[in-house]
Amino acid sequence: VHAKNRPMKKHEEICVFSEGNTLHEGQSINRMPYYPQGLIELPKNTLRRTRNDAGDNTVMSKRKSHKETICTHTNYPTSILKYDIEMNEDRFHECQKPLLLCEYMINTYTEEGELVLDNCVGSGQSAIACLKTNRKYIVMDNKEKHILTTKNRIEQFKEIN
């Protein structure tokens, strides 16, 4: 639709809100929870130096914050997550996110028993993902039809499980 007017979008933002911040461990008492998914443990610990923009292993500077670190895992997530959209009878909303993506986000930023808020619930994917991952949830929407869809989906999920 907009290809002749502006570059086509290849990304969609998902906002994560937390009381904490994303500073390095040791720099903040109030850090945002982060449990990266899909890590692969390295067979042996590896010494890693801070990389510079050129991509080689020279240290960027002599600052105390740029110390060599021991790397124990690999396969850390990037800012791009790829999930297939659901284009079948499980599609309830035009902007519906894949259920696996919702589960991934919930597992990445919360622990079991914690609370997730979705203020634009749409199809109810976040509520179903919370039920599947043992989280509490608060969901809301400004459209009654989305609230009804979500309530029905939650009831169906609870009947099956």
What function would you assign to each model-found segment?
Residues 1-149:
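Core catalytic lobe of class I
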Residues 151-161:
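Short, conserved SAM-binding/catalytic segment
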